[in-house]
């Protein structure tokens, strides 16, 4: 049985109260550390989401590149023979939450994909080049390069 002494509570009761729970200072320190970590993590996560959304534009553009490459194999060296969706035998791509527009430039055959604001408003271009030996290559361009969303 525990009895109160004249100076207050007995030593056993003091020990019980001394070791229980976290202090307010410890809890504030943990909350501050979580806040600091979140301040660095949230902007990085937003950039990651934007890059992921922009990849939809890149995928649509590459799908048109495959169709254009097949068309150019049949048409020979004439890029202008493969510069519309009708000549590529494919429907025009639909817009989405991430893709504002996808198009093929007349006569030059440059494929351009434009992202929406959710994906950064960047552009991605693929320019077909047929060299003197008849080899087809594509040059990557657009505002996505300077933003680090795509590689040249």
Please give the residue ranges for each predicted region.
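Alpha-helical hydrophobic helix detector
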Residues: 28-44
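Periplasmic/extracellular, small/polar-rich flexible segments of pilin-like filament-forming proteins
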Residues: 72-152
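N-terminal alpha-helical signal peptides/signal-anchor transmembrane segments
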Residues: 57-76
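N-terminal leader/signal peptides at the extreme start of proteins
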Residues: 1-24
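Internal alpha-helical transmembrane segments of multi-pass membrane proteins, especially GPCRs
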Residues: 26-29, 50
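Conserved alpha-helical elements of the SDR catalytic core
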Residues: 41, 48, 68
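Aliphatic-rich helix starts adjacent to a transmembrane/signal segment
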Residues: 44-61
């Amino acid at each position: 049985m525990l009895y109160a002494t004249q100076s207050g509570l007995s030593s056993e009761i003091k020990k019980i109260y001394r070791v229980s729970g976290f202090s307010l200072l410890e809890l504030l320190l943990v909350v501050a550390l979580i806040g600091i970590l979140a301040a660095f993590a949230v902007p990085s996560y937003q950039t990651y989401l934007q890059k992921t959304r922009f990849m939809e534009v890149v995928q649509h553009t590459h799908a048109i590149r495959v169709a254009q490459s097949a068309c150019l194999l049949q048409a020979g060296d004439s890029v202008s023979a493969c510069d519309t969706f009708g000549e590529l035998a494919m429907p025009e791509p639909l817009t989405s939450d991430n893709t504002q527009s996808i198009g093929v430039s007349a006569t030059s055959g440059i494929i351009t994909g434009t992202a929406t604001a959710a994906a950064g408003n960047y552009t991605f271009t693929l320019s077909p080049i047929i060299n003197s030996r008849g080899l087809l290559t594509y040059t990557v361009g657009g505002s996505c390069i300077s933003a680090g969303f795509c590689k040249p």
